[in-house]
Design a protein with these regions (language model features):
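Flexible, glycine-rich surface segments
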Residues: 197-253, 259
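N-terminal pre-domain segments of enzymes
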Residues: 38-73
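Surface-exposed beta-loop interaction hotspot
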Residues: 154-216
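Hydrophobic h-region of N-terminal signal peptides that target proteins for export
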Residues: 29-39
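Tryptophan (W) side chains
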Residues: 7, 28-29
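Forkhead-associated
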Residues: 69, 74-144
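Extended, aromatic/histidine-rich regions of cofactor-dependent oxidoreductases associated
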Residues: 182-185, 252-256, 266-268, 274-276, ...
Length: 322
């Protein structure tokens, strides 16, 4: 989570424009997935899954992780003032910043930052003072390298979703982070580690992906995974995630034992037409923890006809729901 896209090679720009998901956690996940996983059939496999889960939760709880997300503010044309005063367009958490800290100047899809005199901030880790220069252009997340503003314990970036631009806010003093009870997991069952047959498309197939904002974007899928689970024939279409695959899926537990909007699963690339799908690593999307994420929803073809009682359960009381 914590993610959170950041998309790979030739698909990077098209998927950034789609901006269907958030990938702040992806660095940790790619490292974890690249480690040699223990083969199932003993304590080594269970230990590997447990270690993966510990890393997943640590990533959720880190500074500027998903549990610290504290706001999403859509920009209007012109000045968008920010600070802790209620008079601002973007109201920051009480006690976190000056009452009038500055403004985001938004015009024709471009965003610039202007600070009030005397306000100290960092942009990409470098100190920024007013009048040096007075206005700073900001790259949105769809460029793959968003400019990050740090204001005390807060940080902000510009995000783009379809035709909308907004300010994403993190607060490292977030009560959600402080009170997080930990993830709820199903017991580890090796039957949910399956070998799938992967069929590559001659050319990437564009599939529509709806997100929680109601936006639908076309995204390329490299192929599909076919497998049997509990006697049922199943099929999933992934998106590309760097040199890995990203599955957005639902199953018969969704809305009951697991998060209603579905779960995510990441895998390495197929080898010799085979792909390992380990549903013990199925995880909740960021929207399970915060209303300020912009997660994608599973396409209809990724609704499994079985109950996958493995991986992340429904979040504990007090977390977000969609």
């Amino acid at each position: 989570m914590g993610p959170v896209l950041d998309w790979s090679a030739n698909f990077a720009h098209s998927l950034h424009r789609c901006a269907v998901r958030d990938l702040s956690h992806i660095g940790w996940w790619l490292v974890a997935l690249s480690l040699a996983a223990a083969e199932p059939g003993g304590g080594g496999y269970r230990a590997e899954i447990q270690k993966w889960r510990e890393g997943y939760e640590a990533d959720l709880k880190k500074d500027n992780g998903w549990l610290t997300l504290a706001g999403l503010f859509w920009l209007k044309e012109g000045n968008n003032t920010f600070g802790t005063s209620a008079e601002n367009d973007i109201v920051l958490p009480k006690g976190s910043a000056p009452g009038q800290a500055g403004a985001f100047l938004f015009h024709d899809g471009k965003t610039r930052l202007r600070l009030k005199d005397g306000v100290r901030a960092l942009v990409n880790g470098d100190p920024l003072r007013t009048k040096s220069p007075a206005e700073i252009p900001l790259n949105p997340d769809t460029t793959g390298k968003p400019d990050r503003i740090t204001l005390g314990r807060l940080s902000m970036i510009v995000i783009q979703r379809s035709t909308r631009f907004g300010i994403r806010l993190w607060d490292n003093n977030s009560a959600v982070r402080r009170d997080f009870p930990g993830s709820q997991w199903f017991p580890i069952h090796e039957m949910f580690r399956v070998t799938a047959q992967f069929t590559s498309y001659a050319q990437p197939k564009m599939i529509p992906i709806l997100n929680v904002l109601g936006d639908t974007e076309q995204n390329p899928s490299p192929g599909f995974a076919a497998f049997k689970l509990e006697g049922k024939t199943c099929r999933l279409e992934p998106l590309l995630e760097g040199d890995h695959l990203f599955f957005i899926l639902k199953d018969l537990t969704s809305g009951k034992e697991t998060y209603a909007a579905g779960r995510f699963l990441y895998t390495t690339m197929p080898k010799d037409g085979k792909l390992i799908l380990d549903f013990n690593k199925a995880e909740n999307p960021p929207c399970a923890f915060t209303p300020f994420a912009t997660c994608p929803l599973p396409p209809k073809q990724n609704h499994l006809p079985v109950a996958v009682t493995a991986g992340d359960r429904k979040p504990a009381h007090g977390t977000a729901s969609h």
